[in-house]
Amino acid sequence: MNETETPNRRLDVLGFFCPIPVHETRKALGEMQEGDILEVRADDPETLQDMPALCNRIGVQLLDTTEDAGEYRFLIKK
């Protein structure tokens, strides 16, 4: 992660399943400014499809997706 990808806000939705991670991500993004970066941590495998779909639907940029031991990390730029 470079300097421009430092999250302004972090959202932990570990242990929650669809639709909670997407709903909470959308809510958090709605409270952020243009250009801000949100880091989301989730462990629901459905988020691997849901987060890119959400980003496309609401017009934000999915900067990065990583997976480590069943935990997914998404960096989203508003």
Kindly label every feature range from the protein language model:
Residues V13-T66:
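Amphipathic, hydrophobic secondary-structure cores in small proteins
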